[in-house]
Swiss-Prot record:
The keyword Zinc does not apply. GO terms for biological process: DNA replication; DNA-templated transcription; regulation of DNA replication; viral DNA genome replication. Phosphorylated. Sumoylation plays a regulatory role in E2 transcriptional activity. Residues 287-367 are annotated as: DNA-binding domain. This is Regulatory protein E2. GO terms for molecular function: DNA binding; DNA-binding transcription factor activity; nucleotide binding. It comes from Human papillomavirus 35.
Length: 367
C-alpha cells in the first residue's frame, strides 16, 4: 500500500511541477491544478491514516492539515469551474490570480485583478503609513452568475458597490485605532490626497448623499471650473478631473483636496510597496512569500547556481547581499527567493536539499 501511495504522490507532484513550468494563463489549466492539489492532500491524508510519517522523503502533514488544505482546494476548484462557465472564462488568468492567497485576502471569497496601491498616513506622521490595495476588477460569483465591480476609495475606506449596496473591505477609522493615536489620517491615491481631519465628521456615520461624489482618476481636460472641498469653495481655470454627474474638479498631483470618494481604478499597479509601519502585514493583500537563505557568501553563490535546475519551484532569486547597518562582525550573506504561492515555497523547501551551514528564514514581502 505504501508503494502505491508513493507512486501516486510522485505522479501527482510531477504534474504539479509541470503546471509551474508551463505558467499557463488558461482557466481550465488552473482547474486541473487545484484537482492535483486536492489529490495530493488525499494521498497525504491516507498515508497519515496508515501511520506513515515520511513518504518519498517528504514529511507527511497531519490529517488536520491535509483536510484543511483539501477543503481549500475543493473550494477553489468549484469556484473556478463556475467562473469557467461565464463570459470571463476567456480572459487571461495567471496562477497568482487564482491562488488561495489572493482568493482569501480582502475582499474575501472572490477573485481580484489589477491592484492599485492606496497609501494612508496616520496622525500626520510620514513615518506612520500603511499601504492597502484597491482592485480594479473584483469578480463576484453568485448562483453561477459572475458580476465584475471596481473598487473605490474615499476617506472612510476602500469599498465596492454591488446591487446598490456599498461593501467596505478596509475601514480607515478602524485602521486608525490600530496604527494611530489621534484618530486622523489622510489618503494618498491616484496622485490625489484625501485629507480627513476628525472635525469633518462626528462619531456617527455620514449620510450616503454626503459621500456620493466620486472622482475619475486620470481623466483630465481644461475648462473653467469650481474647486470642490469640504467646507470651502473657490473658482479657478486649470487642468481638472471630471466628477460623475457633470461636476468638475481641478486636478493637480501635488494639490491637497478634500474629496468624498476617489475612483482609483485606472492605474495598473499589481503589488503594493513596503509600509513603514512594522505592524502592516495583515492589510497588504499582495504580499509575496519569500525565503531568506543566510550563510557564507561562497556557499550561497554555489547554492544559487545549483538552484537553476529547480527553477519551477521558485519565482525569482536575488544576488548575494548583506545588511549594512548591523553590529554583526561575521557579515552574514543573504540570498532571497520569491515564490508565486505558499504551496510553491513549501514544495521548494521539501524538495531542495539546503546545506546545514545555511539558515532558512520564511517570510513575506511586498514587491
Amino acid at each position: 500500500m505504501m508503494e502505491t501511495l508513493s507512486q501516486r504522490l510522485s505522479v501527482c507532484q510531477d504534474k504539479i511541477l509541470e503546471h509551474y513550468e508551463t505558467d499557463s494563463t488558461c482557466l481550465s489549466d488552473h482547474i486541473q491544478y487545484w484537482k492535483l492539489i486536492r489529490l495530493e492532500c488525499a494521498v497525504f491524508y491516507k498515508a497519515r491514516e496508515m501511520g506513515i510519517k515520511t513518504l518519498n522523503h517528504q514529511v507527511v502533514p497531519t490529517q488536520a492539515i491535509s483536510k484543511a488544505k483539501a477543503m481549500q482546494a475543493i473550494e477553489l476548484q468549484l469556484m473556478l469551474e463556475t467562473l469557467n462557465t461565464t463570459e470571463y472564462s476567456t480572459e487571461t488568468w495567471t496562477l497568482q490570480e487564482t491562488s488561495i492567497e489572493l482568493y482569501t485576502t480582502v475582499p474575501q471569497g472572490c477573485f481580484k485583478k489589477h491592484g492599485v496601491t492606496v497609501e494612508v498616513q496616520f496622525d500626520g506622521d510620514k513615518q506612520n503609513t500603511m499601504h492597502y490595495t484597491n482592485w480594479t476588477h473584483i469578480y463576484i460569483l453568485e448562483d453561477s452568475i459572475c458580476t465584475v465591480v471596481k473598487g473605490l476609495v474615499n476617506y472612510k475606506g476602500i469599498y465596492y458597490v454591488h446591487q446598490g449596496v456599498e461593501t467596505y473591505y478596509v475601514t480607515f477609522r478602524e485602521e486608525a485605532k490600530k496604527y494611530g493615536k489621534k484618530n486622523i489620517w489622510e489618503v494618498h491615491v491616484g496622485g490625489q490626497v484625501i485629507v480627513c481631519p476628525e472635525s469633518v465628521f462626528s462619531s456617527t456615520e455620514l449620510s450616503t448623499a454626503e459621500i456620493a461624489t466620486q472622482l475619475h482618476a486620470y481623466n483630465t481636460t481644461e475648462t473653467h471650473t469650481k474647486a470642490c472641498s469640504v467646507g470651502t469653495t473657490e473658482t479657478q481655470k486649470t487642468n481638472h478631473k471630471r466628477l460623475r454627474g457633470g461636476t468638475e474638479l481641478p486636478y493637480n498631483p501635488t494639490k491637497r483636496v478634500r474629496l468624498s470618494a476617489v475612483d482609483s481604478v485606472d492605474r495598473g499597479v499589481y503589488s503594493t510597496s513596503d509600509c513603514t509601519n512594522k505592524d502592516r502585514c495583515g492589510s497588504c493583500s499582495t504580499t509575496t512569500p519569500i525565503v531568506h537563505l543566510k550563510g557564507d557568501a561562497n556557499t550561497l553563490k554555489c547554492l544559487r547556481y545549483r538552484l537553476g535546475k529547480y527553477k519551477a519551484l521558485y519565482q525569482d532569486a536575488s544576488s548575494t547581499w548583506r545588511w549594512t547597518c548591523t553590529n554583526d562582525k561575521k557579515q552574514i550573506a543573504i540570498v532571497t527567493l520569491t515564490y508565486t504561492t505558499e504551496y510553491q515555497r513549501d514544495k521548494f523547501l521539501t524538495t531542495v536539499k539546503i546545506p546545514n551551514t545555511v539558515t532558512v528564514s520564511k517570510g513575506y514581502m511586498s514587491i
